[in-house]
Amino acid sequence: MLVAKVIVPVPLDKTFDYIVGEKRAEVGSFVKVQFGKRSYTGLILELRNLTEESEYKLKEIADVLELEKIDTKTLQFLQWVSEYNIIPIGMVFKYLLPIGLLDSSSREIKTFKYSNDKVDNLTQKQKQLLDFFKENKDYYFSENDIKKNLNIGSSVVKTLLKYGLLEEKSEKVSSIDYNFNVNNVNLNTLTDEQNSVLNQINSHVDSNEKTILLQGETGSGKTEIYFHLIYNYLKNDNDNQTLFLIPEIALTSQLIDRFNKQFNSSIAIWHSDISNSKKRDIWLGVLNGNIKVVIGARSALFLPFKKLSLIIVDEEHDSSYKQVDNGCYNARDMAVLRAKINNIPIILGSATPSLESIINTENGKYKKVELKNRFGKAILPTIDIVDLKKEKNTILSKFLIEKMKEHLGNKNQVLLFLNRRGYSPIALCKECGHKFLCKNCSCALTNHKSKNKLICHQCGYSIDLINYCPSCNSKDSVIFYGVGVEKVEEEVKKIFPEKHIAIITSDTMLNINLMKSTLHDIEEKNIDIIIGTQIITKGYHFPDLTLVGVLDADAGLFGGQFKAIEYTYQSLTQVIGRAGRGEKVGEAVLQTYSPENIIIQALKNNDKCMILEFDKQNRELMEVPPFGKMAVLIVSHDKEYDLIKKIKEILRVFPVDSNLEILGPTQTIPYKLNNNFRYKIIVKTKNNINIQKLIKTVLEKVNLNSVKIKIDINPYNIP
């Protein structure tokens, strides 16, 4: 009797046996199976002949889907992702095939827009949704946008529609032609330096050195090299496919325009915001080999490529490649793994490479090529440092204001960078010290003045802004500490009332169309001043942007994270690099309370080596990645007593070993999230220890049914 080991998309780290019967099934085939009371699409991992009768009554595969089968290399990749990150194989399968994707056949998507607010007695969620539409009344949003940004379901949308508060529009979703014609390509000519780097990459690949770090200054033209590589691989074999990973999908609009212009063809874009029917088209096109190029966020790494020949990871240092929900993994590292399994080249590009990648070039695992000059006549911005200790509690220093006047007077654009969002981070009572905290989490609520609300940035809980203290009843006693984006906007409007301002944060850029519209306004010079947070550091090119002001250069330096030095240097280098990318000369102003700090000085002097050595010494001393292995176990439960009891049980199982260090348990930040208490255990080992095997062995000895546990191998941040 032929039996198939089938991966089922459930959060269990095991496969399930099904009888094949008379059906034609192969390893890698997609199949329909009954699991419990539900029907799922599964994936055959292995076939074997069962000679003896099973102690369980096996079910038969219901159907074998008429789809291309997954190759053995992709199956091996899924297994390695599961084992390395300690993620159940069923969850990893859902990365490859999200549940319900193949059921999506609709060619129509409904979007909604604000109509009016002439109805009283709305519920809190109905009012929240209506406020959202009112604040963005010029834009249509899909149910997917609403769910993603507000966690509000379709029933609330339908109620507002029934009341006549929203207007509805149906859009046909066309099946885009992704045909790629290598004879219809019009690539830009490379500079001598770019051409030299391209030749170096090809030489390394010919020598079977296929993992390559491309370090290039901001604005040096790394993307042009990517395009030439893509063209070469597609030209060499019509069946070849390439994957271009980017950290933020908001980056795609400029990148897609450049690609379409040079390749004269549409490109498949993969990210969470596209409709299920479009995802289905792309997924099937990748599986059958019709789609040749995919640009996407980290989830695109799990697409079922038929013949993947090249992977490019742009901004390889970016923390957005790290997934921290529904299984933790680093898409950059998993991309390197997939390239290794497929024996194909992978290019890791960045102006500010991660320390891990630099160490890998030093020990010979990766090869490194460099672009040292900006493209064309562009030069790196000059940098001035302002000591905020000499200023009078102002958001914008006198020096920065004068620089803004100078650049705006020359009809150029200014970017103000803030490492926060919201209006002011903390609301409290000046009389009794009461802090306004989220009822679900242990987080301080953030003041969003434009919405007149205090909002939790963890779970989305909000309350109306009040002028009295609910603890001591003092009136007009609520004060706010800290500076946020809205506060900066308020200050800028006072000084430059006639200038047009755009705010680019993860809060304001609610979907890709809104981001595209804002970027278009900037490119058309309808915007004078951009105020942004981390999202604005990512690879944007604005030729008329000549001044960058960093309002809080110290932010992130003293937060206790072991990667704080690297993160701060990377984000500031990237945002400074937005200035002067065209023919105009750029300037940057760093406002700081620590002007003598080694990172601030290294930025001013463009001294990468100083930062690198300083960071290496610190991490080597602490024995943290890449000079040791680390994992964080976050254990949670809605009852704190039961949680602590279970954590003690876990700790007792860890062996005593000189190569092993256990830190904790300690409360996470935030300590309470979505009504669950959370503690963390940090596991540190020498590099020669198999940390995954150690953790799995420990957890197998403990009954974890009563608690939730999240495992993060090589964490980016420790909560």
Regions found by a protein language model. Give the residues of each.
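Short, flexible, solvent-exposed loop/turn segments with mixed acidic/basic and small polar residues
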Residues: 7, 620-625, 668-674
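Solvent-exposed beta-strand sheet faces enriched in polar/charged residues
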Residues: 169, 417, 448, 591, ...
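Short secondary-structure junctions
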Residues: 496-499, 654-662, 702-707
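Inter-lobe coupling/hinge segments of SF2-like helicase ATPases
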Residues: 185-191, 208-644, 680-681, 689, ...
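Short, amphipathic alpha-helical segments that act as regulatory/interfacial helices
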Residues: 79-82, 130, 134, 161, ...
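Accessory, non-ATPase domains that flank or precede helicase/AAA+ motor cores in DNA-metabolism machines
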Residues: 1-350, 362-378, 657, 674, ...
